[in-house]
Amino acid sequence: METRDRKARNFIQTNFQALLWHGLPVAALVIWGAFCITNNLWYDEAYSASMVSLPWKRLIYITATDDHSPFYYVLLKLFYHLCGGGTHFWALKLMSVLFMLGYMLLGKYYVAKLFDRKISVYFMTFSLLMPIFSVQAGNVRMYAVALFFLTLTGLSAYDIFREATGKKWIVFCLASICTVYCHTFALIQTFLFYGLFLFTILICRKKELIRGFLISGFTVAIVFSPWLAVTCRQFILRMRYDDGSTAELATLNSVMDYCKEWFSAVETPIGIVVLLGIALCLVLSYGAVDWVRQHGNAAPAIGAATFALTGIVGGVISATINNCFMGRYAFPGMGFVMLWYAVGFAQLVENAGEKSRKWWIAGTLGTAGLCFVLQYTSEIHLEYDQGLETYENFIETEVTENDAIIGPYTHTIFLNVYHPKLHYYLVGYKLYSLPFANTEALMEYSQLNSYENVWYICFKGGEPDPMEDGYNYEVELEFHYMYYDFVIYRLEPKTIEDARAQRSKPT
């Protein structure tokens, strides 16, 4: 009777595991797909949307003077125009979701091939439940693309280590090239991973792999070398001229910001999610260390070390040279962390007794599930925020094509991505690499003489102080949108009487 019950339990577990193995990528597509339906963009996403709206030559020029290579923007621009273009940017979000789906399929097939289906299911489960994946899934930035290619790089490296073939080396090399062209810190992660991979080859005396490794490494270096020169020049210029990133270097408080972003979200952190995420990481790391020791397989540890070293390198650079690192810059290596979590969870479940196993599973997955629900709900509220509709209604009813909209600095005018044909000005200075359309520097009031109405948009608490010499102002609209509280003022030119009255005021 006991044997029959055990067989029944094994049958149920096997079929449930098969159901999860097939169903988790579909669930991810549905859950993350909710982020690509709306048209809400925050500043960095609006920057990407403006980039893909530019002519090809201008796009390449800006990437050569900004922080990132054109690789991601080229992919995004092609996909954007393939989906019809326009000012509804669902296609931009969809591309990130599709690369996240590709990452899940790597977990389904490649992780299952290299480990087993159980590890594959755990890998996909934690990938779906970790809050940072919900934050980045629909983000119109290069992080999802870099996640896919760096994960492919790592898995193909382990596949080569087990049994090298020419095709595997080609996949490894191509994935590495795509990764280094995604983001500067994806480049750093790839370099660190290559170093650890070479160290492993030498320690394990796999001399037959050295030739392929060197060929792949030199190929990646040669292909990336033109942009490496650009990257170095950008970094030097930023150190020389960007006072904000050199005067305020990273401190211990910055480590907390990194943790907020890795375990929750830096803009909208949820305290309990951060704390539970750190606790979960410690528990699963304990199991992962035991798994590596018991199986004599250091592959998950090498991946986790790559992620950890990226955080350390980024933190050291930000604390000593230039405050340029943010937690999400390490996101491309999160696939390595999820593999670390997966083997750790498998080991904890395997080592647990019959009675305590259910508690381990329920406690671990319940904690991860709670973090997911809290963060996912927060992200959905942001994604479906109605502030954009308020702004669109205002533009439609109050603003004409012969109006000018002024902002005190770049972050206040990114909403122009929705109305690129209107006229925009930045007070006093415009960055040469700014991609937003029809945006100029406002140097003198005479530039505004031909406009029917003049508007000033800033964040709540700000006022049109730079314009008060020549204009009176009054609040026309206050609205909240995603992370921002905006105020729009109507500016009216001062009359001679207004100027006299202002001069007569006591100072």
What does each model-found stretch correspond to?
Residues P506-T507:
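Short, solvent-exposed mixed-charge patches
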Residues T495-R500:
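Short, charged/polar, Gly/Pro-enriched secondary-structure boundary elements
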Residues F16, L20-E350, W360-E492:
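Membrane-proximal helix-loop-helix interfaces that form the catalytic/acceptor-binding platform
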Residues S356:
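Membrane-embedded catalytic cores of phosphoryl/pyrophosphoryl-handling enzymes
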Residues M1-Q13:
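Short, Lys/Arg-rich, polar N-terminal cytosolic tail immediately upstream
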Residues R503:
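SAM/dcSAM-binding transferase cores
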